[in-house]
Amino acid sequence: MASTFRLSISFLTLILFSLWVVEAHTSRKLISIKEKEGQDISHLLKDGEFDDPSLYMYFTLNDLKLGTKLLIYFYKNDLQKLPPLLTRQQADLIPFTKSKLDFLLDHFSITKDSPQGKAIKETLGHCDAKAIEGEHKFCGTSLESLIDLVKKTMGYNVDLKVMTTKVMVPAQNSISYALHNYTFVEAPKELVGIKMLGCHRMPYPYAVYYCHGHKGGSRVFEVNLVTDDGRQRVVGPAVCHMDTSTWDADHVAFKVLKMEPRSAPVCHFFPLDNIVWVTK
């Protein structure tokens, strides 16, 4: 049984995980921690501007109003290419810590210096890292553990609502997952007096969600955006992190927004495979 499970995970790793990692993975840009200071971002620049479309998800609090136009990239992973969500029983059979990296790479038949090996190391590093001041964070490795940890963080006796980003087009059109100019066609609606957790799907051989929130430091909005040609609409959550004073000074958001590090709120949209939990 154990060998069959190991082989099935390895097969999924080679076929699904490999395809996923080589594509742009937006969630990794939304995490406000890094393993070391001074990360080189020169590979993201072209002629002094950012050349990675997945970075076009950040905006400022002043942008959050009716009529504002922003260049945004909403990326959708092909669900058939996403690694599977394990049960708790399956996930508990596999260690999930950076200290077991060599074992895990061998378990999944992945080399350390491959894109997949580097992605595994990065995900484990983020999940093992201590929370920054005022932050609560965890990684869910199964549906059961994800729900349990969300309830533990937000309260066992509260009603929870799940929010995701949705892209909609008329039936005769296909969705274009590319950079588009989007305009706020309705005034963003703030969800007042709620708790929130943002859960970002991370690159790993099976589904892992990195969830984090900031105590009293985030504002959540429901937004309604439309492309210039009016053919594509996006509805979903946006969050503004009001206190960035403890963020890494090299966080890519400060560079994308061309702001002084830790000086002002940072807002962002969510990729389509991310989850936002809020109290009702």
Swiss-Prot record:
Tissue: Expressed in cotyledons, radicle, floral buds, open flowers, roots and developing seeds, but not in leaves. Highly expressed in the root tips. Detected in young leaves, hypocotyls, stems and mature seed funiculum.
GO annotation, cellular component aspect: Golgi stack; protein storage vacuole
Domain BURP: start-end pairs: 58-280
Name of this protein: BURP domain protein USPL1
Listed GO biological process terms: seed development
Organism listed in the record: Arabidopsis thaliana (Mouse-ear cress)
Signal peptide positions on this chain: 1-24
Gene giving rise to this polypeptide: USPL1
InterPro entries tied to this protein: BURP, BURP_dom
